[in-house]
């Protein structure tokens, strides 16, 4: 699974996922399914905000990469992918600027057009079940919830899907592609089944114990994408870099 993730996701997304797991004390070498899930969620959040801007009239417009209208305001603020301290700093800044109610839990995005925080969900299960779990956890009508599945289904608060149909179709197509690529490599069943995931986790722990005494080689390589991203992370105009087109899965 780890090899699949590194082949099928943008290096920037992979490194952000690595940092997230490290922050929470999780080992991506063992919890490979979680590694894949985090990368998938990050990519969906980035795709959700791709190309969406607000013009001078306050209207939401779609601008493709390379368009000269660089001074347009980005419609979405990406919160997901930041370390917790920085993420809460961004949330507090948004609340102070817009008057939005501070959420109890860290959301994934902020929509400047609709003036609301957004929680993005990507599920391997039924969308309505995952939606209810999210709603019960958040317990706030102020945070908008939007759930996507790997089967092309989606569910959103009050059936308000925020994005246009084409933008949502891009996300659904990407998720379906990830599912197909996992299935072709025999990875989908373990990814979708908690029982199989636990079995793989135990197997990984046992394997790690056996290999603990072996010499290891640590890679110090940093992807060019992340080198560009890091100094721009606090810049409100960093989106062109952040929204770098995601790598497609190579054929088996």
UniProtKB/Swiss-Prot annotation:
One of its GO terms (biological process) is viral translational frameshifting. It is found in: Host cytoplasm; Host nucleus. The record marks 195, 198-199 as: Important for efficient shutoff activity and nuclear localization. InterPro entries: PA/PA-X (IPR001009), PA/PA-X_sf (IPR038372). The record marks 28, 65, 202-203, 206 as: Important for efficient shutoff activity. GO terms for molecular function: RNA binding. The active site is at 80, 108. The probable endonuclease active site in the N-terminus and the basic amino acid cluster in the C-terminus are important for the shutoff activity. The C-terminus acts as a nuclear localization signal. The C-terminus is recruited to host protein complexes involved in nuclear Pol II RNA processing. Belongs to the influenza viruses PA-X family. Keywords: Decay of host mRNAs by virus, Eukaryotic host gene expression shutoff by virus, Host cytoplasm, Host gene expression shutoff by virus, Host mRNA suppression by virus, Host nucleus, Host-virus interaction. The keyword Phosphoprotein does not apply. Plays a major role in the shutoff of the host protein expression by cleaving mRNAs probably via an endonuclease activity. This host shutoff allows the virus to escape from the host antiviral response. Hijacks host RNA splicing machinery to selectively target host RNAs containing introns for destruction. This may explain the preferential degradation of RNAs that have undergone co- or post-transcriptional processing. This is Protein PA-X. It comes from the Viruses. Its main location: host cell.
